[in-house]
Each structure stands twice: as structure tokens, then as C-alpha cells.
Amino acid sequence: EDLLTIRSRLVGSGYIGGKATGMLIARNILLQDAPELWQPNLEPHDSSYLGTDAYYAFLVHNGLWPAIMRQRSPEGYLSEAPSLRKAILTGQFPAEVRSELERLLDHYGQYPILVRSSSLQEDGFGNAFAGKYDSVFLINQGAPEQRLAELENAIRQVYASSMSDDALVYRKQRGLDQREEPMALLIQRVNGRFHGRYYLPDAAGVGVSRNTFAWDSTMNPKAGMVRLVMGLGTRAVDRIEGDHACVMALDHPGRQPFRNPDEHYRFSQHLVDLLDLQEGHLETRPLSQLLDTVQDLPMAQMGEIDRAASTRAEQIGLPGPVWRLTFRPLVQFSSFIQRLSSLLSTLEAGYQHPVDVEFTLHIDEQGEPSFNLVQCRPLATIGETGPVTLPEHLPAEREIFRTQGHFMGGNISLAITRVIRVDAAIYANLNINQRYDVARRVGEVVRESSASTLLIGPGRWGTSSPELGVPVRFADIAGVSALVEV
């Protein structure tokens, strides 16, 4: 029955890829292993699939097969990629594929859709490919010809992302560079609701069944963790400069890693990602601005009124009240934590491995959440060793640095043979161009040796804002064993 359903929603033929397979397997595990909980609380998905044969047909139709063969050779693996990316972005689709895409759009009507990568190797054990391939939101409004053109552009963008430097280096680092990696696509109706000109889910998040960021010694890593945001899940998946998801350990959801109320406010969500039907694409809106124009958001479940800030706003003539996205009511007065904990533990048991999931939430009139599971994959960042025994009575002169807590990645013991450090004081005095020069130089030094390397630097590694850290790319630091952000 499942295979027949997939076939009825498949454009072309071939494989549907790892991401689509993971989503379907995870949903079936929940419905079969805990039907009494998930049949009423797991929202049905509305997914279509663009098979791997459509990817091959696109390459052949545009005369790109010889270039693909050259790119697969060791000498052409990186050098052929830029021209391939450019050619893919300007390629045309075979008539039979275009016809099936038109039927796909007829099915979705004018609901927003998300075009997601689902390559053959993606989301497999040990190969998360997190953030390496593109996903594209489409408003899906307007004339049929316009909607088809936008869908084709989105598909080209995802296809082209398979030839990005980051993706190619990631595959090579894991010994996958000489294996087939055809790109299938998972096309889904975006889960959410219309709020006037805006479309967004109530909330979205990323959950992991093992908490590798246990900032308190009383927390049980096996209880899991969640990063939760209001609106689209892009702000939960990605590290956004200057804005923060709500991070909760599922065994202590009320315990936050903040020292005072100012930190709690600073490290919270102030911006909301949503689809703007008038602008025609994904937009980011300040929460206060969104609440000025949208009155039917479930704020009573997701936030709390900041009384002091509301009083100050009233005194200077600003509209109120002032809301803070804490998600405390959702945690305290609904089944959210219990349901998410059950979801993660059930999937970990089914996979026989810790898992990483993405989901959206629909909050009903009683304040209870239902889940839409959009992705599930084996958690790729758990430690590679058992418990690590630290040496006792280590002489001070042999200790380079020491830190406790705020560590991610699980237990691991490595013999570090090289340390690269960016001096924070010097870096702070550099201009923007000089900071990009530092990032390029770091990449050059990393690639000079395959030795086990510890990289230490100020702020965030991989930031897109040089004032907040070192703007390296994944390809620059893929060979590093451990990162330290000071």
C-alpha cells in the first residue's frame, strides 16, 4: 500500500532518495509502534517525489552527461563542478517531465510548497548532509505558467547545489566521492495557516534523542533536546546571527542556560520567518511588527507578556503589550514535552540509533499540539568512543586550556597534533576585508596538512557576518577534528 501511494505521487521513476525515505519510515514507525498516541496527533503529510531518473533525464536532455562523467573522475571532481553548476541552472526540462510537474502543481492548488533535496546518500547512517544541499520555499501563487517557471527554477537550484564546494568536500571527506549520488526531490505542501498576507506554522523545531549540549550535570543526555521557534523552522535548523531558538532539555525544559533575565531576553527569538504572499517569497519579520498586523496567532501558548517592557512601551507611546517567546505555557500546560519525548524515544528504538528530527506544530483551541514530522535521520554527531577518562593531577604547565559544559558532539578522545588559533584581540581590530582574508588563510593552513587539528577562534566559525566570528566555509575547515568558539 505504501509503495502504491509513493508511485501515485512520483514524477518520473527511480529512487526517491534518503530524505524522503527517512520521513516515510519514521512516520510508519510512530503509527505502528504507538498508534494510540500518533494516529490522532500526527498530521498527514502531503508529499510528492521527483525520482532520480528525472535527474538523469535532465542531464541527458541538456547534453551534460559527458561533463558529469568528467566530474566523477578524481582529477575533475572539483574542477568540473563550477561549469556544471552554471549549466544546470540554465538547463531545460524534457517535455514529459514538464507535463508531470504541471499535474503536480494542479494537485497543490495555490498552497505554498517546499522543494527539498533527497539525494541517494542523504540522511543515511553517518551521512547527514545537513545544510549541504538546498531547499527552496515557493509561494505558489499566480498564473499556472508563472508557478511552473518558479518550480522549475527551484528544481534547478537544488540540482545545482549537488555540485557546490561544500557538498563535494563533504562527500570526499566521507569516501563517497566515487559513489553514485543522483538527486531526487521531496516536494511538500508547507504545513501552516494563512494569516492575511502571511503563511506560517504555529511553531517548528529540531529534536534530537540524545542531548549533546547538556549544560547542567543533572541533565540526562538520553532524554533528548529540542530547538523550538515560532514560524517556519528555518530559524531552528540554521544558526541565525543575532537571533536564537528556544533550547530545552526534555528532562528539564524549564531550566535555561542563562545567568540573568537580560541574557534570557538577549538569547531568545525576536524575528519570525514566514511566507509573505504579497512579496512572493520567504521573509523575516520582527515579532512586534507581525503582532501589529496579525491578531489570530496562538501567542498565549507560545509566549508571555513582559510586564516591565510593556509599561515602558506605554510610557513612550508605543503599542503593547510586549510579548516574549518563551514557550513556557506550551511546556507547562500542554502535552508537548511528553509527546515529543515519546516521538524521539520511539524513533530511536525503531532506528536502533539516536535520531535527529524536524517537525512543525499545529496548536489547537485547547492549546494542545499536533505534530507534522518532516524529516528523520540518524544522529550523526554522537561521540565515537565510550566514556573518556580524564587524567588526574595533570601538571598546570601541561594544560593548554580547560572548560566545562557548553560542549557538543558527545564523548570523543583524539590525539591532537596541531592547534590553529585566531587571536581574538588582534582579530577584533581588523576591518571586514581583513577578516575575510583571515578566513581564507585559515582554510589554506587547514588544507596544508591532514594532521588531527584543533581550531580555536573568536565568535562563531562559519558565520556569514564577519563582525560575529570567522566567515569560513565548510569546505575550508572540513578536515578539522574539533572547533572551539571563544
Language-model segments: which ranges?
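Conserved mixed alpha/beta core segments that line enzyme active sites in large multi-domain catalysts
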Residues: 1-37, 92-485
